[in-house]
């Protein structure tokens, strides 16, 4: 809480108009590959198991585009449900601590669907739509001035944009305030993890 408070104060003192919380509470040193961008969201959800057997792990390590992770954040083994995911509480904390308008961020359904292993759904698109349903339910409860969906994997996979946009739009449609989408190439710790284009 103190670190979050310091981030907010620093941003306000710097004169920013829209304040975020820095996401420091999401970081897990056990999973530095994605700075808490994945595990924070899927860990509390139902239908995803954290431990994989040797065969499941080997299959994941063959998955194209996941070389930046040593193991998946989990394997989908049943229908994805909200579980104990609670984005409203950290959003409220941000709103309570800030004196200016705030932006709350959440990892998007495409990114989440690309990083998990799967033994339940028929396609990555189906996984993305299941994540979109959970995230839409969470987004509907948020009172931030701007709610941003972070999609760090999509620019490297433009061939998936059609179904990714359906999932992203499902979340955007649930946002009661202003929605935004942030695309990037996932440049964690100065290491580019995929190639792509902004075209």
Give the predicted meaning of each segment.
Residues 1-199:
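Domain-level signal for soluble alpha/beta catalytic cores
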């Amino acid at each position: 809480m103190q670190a979050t408070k310091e981030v907010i104060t620093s941003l306000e003192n710097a004169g920013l108009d829209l304040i975020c919380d820095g996401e420091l509470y999401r970081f897990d040193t056990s999973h530095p590959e994605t700075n808490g961008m994945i595990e924070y969201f899927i860990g509390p959800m139902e239908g995803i198991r954290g431990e994989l057997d040797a065969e499941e792990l080997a299959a994941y390590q063959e998955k194209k585009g996941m070389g930046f992770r040593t193991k998946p954040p989990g394997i989908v083994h049943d229908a994805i449900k909200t579980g104990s995911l609670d984005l409203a509480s950290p959003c409220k904390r941000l709103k309570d601590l800030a004196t200016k308008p705030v932006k709350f961020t959440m990892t998007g359904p495409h990114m989440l669907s690309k990083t998990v292993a799967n033994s339940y759904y028929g396609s990555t698109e189906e996984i993305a739509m299941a994540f979109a349903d959970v995230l839409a339910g969470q987004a509907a409860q948020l009172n931030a001035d701007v709610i941003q969906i972070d999609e760090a994997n999509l620019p490297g996979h433009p061939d998936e944009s059609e179904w990714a946009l359906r999932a992203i739009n499902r979340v955007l449609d649930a946002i009661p305030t202003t929605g935004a989408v942030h695309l990037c190439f996932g440049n964690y710790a100065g290491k580019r993890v995929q190639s792509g284009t902004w075209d």
